[in-house]
């Protein structure tokens, strides 16, 4: 089974898969921001949270120690995080789509040409740019009441207070940077140029097919 990718293209497909999985996994994991509330550790992503306060029987706040997403899109603490959720999700979807096509190119001949590889690299650049934009928007939501309660009531936009950034935030940003800088460059050398003989064969095959169809139509 021949591949439609060069040796560089095979490495590009592998790296594309790694960056897409890293960014997408980080997007879904609620470990972008770490803080504490009522003596319990709390962590956030853009649309998920681990450990949250609820009213107990005595109207006292108690911490529920579990992870989950917000009940609705409108329940996400800030407009910045809502935008971050949409933008980052779109970027991850684009990177996953390109990575899937790149992996298929390792197994299928004539799937990815030199020009197609460059177009896929451009799509990776856009996907990485979207995820990077989401990472840049994320600090704009640190002034929401929910985040401030977790960060010692001293957090603000681009000010963490007592909180700290989590590994998932760095992983998402790193995956986006690798997709934009490395994968986009490697994609320029990923696809194979079609062989002239194969081009001639395809042209002749198509010409014969059209001739047979025309002959069939002209017969009474």
UniProtKB/Swiss-Prot annotation:
<keyword id="KW-0325">Glycoprotein</keyword>
<keyword id="KW-0812">Transmembrane</keyword>
<comment type="similarity">
    <text>Belongs to the LHFP family.</text>
</comment>
<dbReference type="Pfam" id="PF10242">
    <property type="entry name" value="L_HMGIC_fpl"/>
</dbReference>
<feature type="glycosylation site" description="N-linked (GlcNAc...) asparagine">
    <location>
        <position position="153"/>
    </location>
</feature>
<keyword id="KW-0732">Signal</keyword>
<protein>
    <recommendedName>
        <fullName>LHFPL tetraspan subfamily member 1 protein</fullName>
    </recommendedName>
</protein>
<feature type="transmembrane region" description="Helical">
    <location>
        <begin position="165"/>
        <end position="185"/>
    </location>
</feature>
<feature type="transmembrane region" description="Helical">
    <location>
        <begin position="86"/>
        <end position="106"/>
    </location>
</feature>
<dbReference type="GO" id="GO:0016020">
    <property type="term" value="C:membrane"/>
</dbReference>
<dbReference type="InterPro" id="IPR019372">
    <property type="entry name" value="LHFPL"/>
</dbReference>
<feature type="transmembrane region" description="Helical">
    <location>
        <begin position="122"/>
        <end position="142"/>
    </location>
</feature>
<feature type="signal peptide">
    <location>
        <begin position="1"/>
        <end position="23"/>
    </location>
</feature>
<keyword id="KW-0472">Membrane</keyword>
<keyword id="KW-1133">Transmembrane helix</keyword>
């Amino acid at each position: 089974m021949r591949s439609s990718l060069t040796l560089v293209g095979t490495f590009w497909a592998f790296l594309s898969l790694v960056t897409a999985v890293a960014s997408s996994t980080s997007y879904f994991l609620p470990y972008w921001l770490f803080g504490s509330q009522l003596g319990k550790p709390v962590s956030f992503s853009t649309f998920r949270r681990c450990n949250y306060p609820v009213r107990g029987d005595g109207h006292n706040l108690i911490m529920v120690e579990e992870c989950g997403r917000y009940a609705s899109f409108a329940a996400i603490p800030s407009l910045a995080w809502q935008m971050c959720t949409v933008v980052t999700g779109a970027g991850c979807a684009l990177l996953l789509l390109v990575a899937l096509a790149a992996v298929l190119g390792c197994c299928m001949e004539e799937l990815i040409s030199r020009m197609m590889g460059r177009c896929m690299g451009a799509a990776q650049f856009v996907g990485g740019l979207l995820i990077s934009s989401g990472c840049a928007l994320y600090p704009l939501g640190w002034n929401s009441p929910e985040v401030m309660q977790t960060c010692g009531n001293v957090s603000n936009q681009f000010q963490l207070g007592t909180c700290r950034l989590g590994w998932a935030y760095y992983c998402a940003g790193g995956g986006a940077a690798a997709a934009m800088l490395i994968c986009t460059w490697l994609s320029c050398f990923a696809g194979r140029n079609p062989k002239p003989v194969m081009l001639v064969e395809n042209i002749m095959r198509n010409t014969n097919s059209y001739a047979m169809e025309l002959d069939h139509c002209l017969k009474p």
